[in-house]
């Protein structure tokens, strides 16, 4: 199961890859069909993490405040078996997968997306770019040549942007919330010291009060 620091980096990576774009959202598996239909065509307004929880806000316009009542939040917790897998054209630089071991979307091997090439993307697979990874990504398919592969396995959620696709499989949680619902989850989780608004002292005090080691 990815720990909180990985989810924070994943949140930043998804913001780099899809932030400000109107996304096509599907649920190939069908279990999240209603939620996907509500998000389809909306703009990803950013991405946040709190502990092991990922929060993605969607709205009808790119210039919206996250406090707007029309913003819908997608909450995802990978759990033990959840994973994101990625595929895209040469403009789309992302890791192969995050979470439980998975092959890349559709098992297509012609365009390696290892490690990532940006500040948030680098190291998502647990390390920096390997030799030749940048060259491999640079020689991936051109935007006009790339086509989204068929979903592989039980894909709960698919996000399709201008240059690439992200598939979510096997999450412990995948649900839509309003702002009050997000706030309720965050209160239950307690402080996250990795967040800019995280109360580090409160986190340390809570950690010291626990008998179970962290």
Question: What would you call each of these model-derived segments?
Answer:
Residues 1-214:
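Structured catalytic/nucleic-acid-binding cores of DNA maintenance enzymes
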């Amino acid at each position: 199961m990815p720990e909180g620091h990985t989810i924070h980096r994943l949140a930043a990576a998804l913001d780099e890859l899809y932030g400000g774009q109107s996304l096509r959202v599907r649920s190939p598996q069908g279990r999240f069909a209603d939620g996907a239909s509500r998000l389809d065509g909306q703009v990803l307004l950013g991405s946040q993490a709190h502990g092991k929880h990922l929060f993605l806000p969607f709205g009808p316009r790119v210039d919206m405040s996250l406090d707007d009542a029309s913003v819908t939040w997608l909450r995802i917790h990978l759990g033990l078996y959840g994973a994101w897998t990625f595929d895209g054209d040469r403009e789309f630089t992302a890791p192969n997968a995050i979470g439980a071991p998975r092959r890349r979307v559709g098992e297509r091997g012609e365009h390696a997306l290892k490690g990532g090439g940006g500040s948030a993307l680098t190291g998502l697979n647990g390390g920096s770019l390997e030799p030749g990874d940048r060259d491999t990504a640079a020689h991936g398919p051109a935007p006009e040549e790339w086509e989204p592969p068929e979903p592989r396995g039980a894909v709960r959620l698919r996000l399709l942007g201008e240059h690439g696709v992200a598939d979510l499989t096997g999450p412990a949680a995948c649900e839509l919330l309003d702002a009050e619902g997000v706030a309720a989850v965050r209160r239950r989780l307690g402080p996250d010291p990795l967040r800019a608004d995280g109360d580090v002292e409160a986190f340390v005090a809570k950690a010291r009060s626990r008998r179970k080691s962290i």
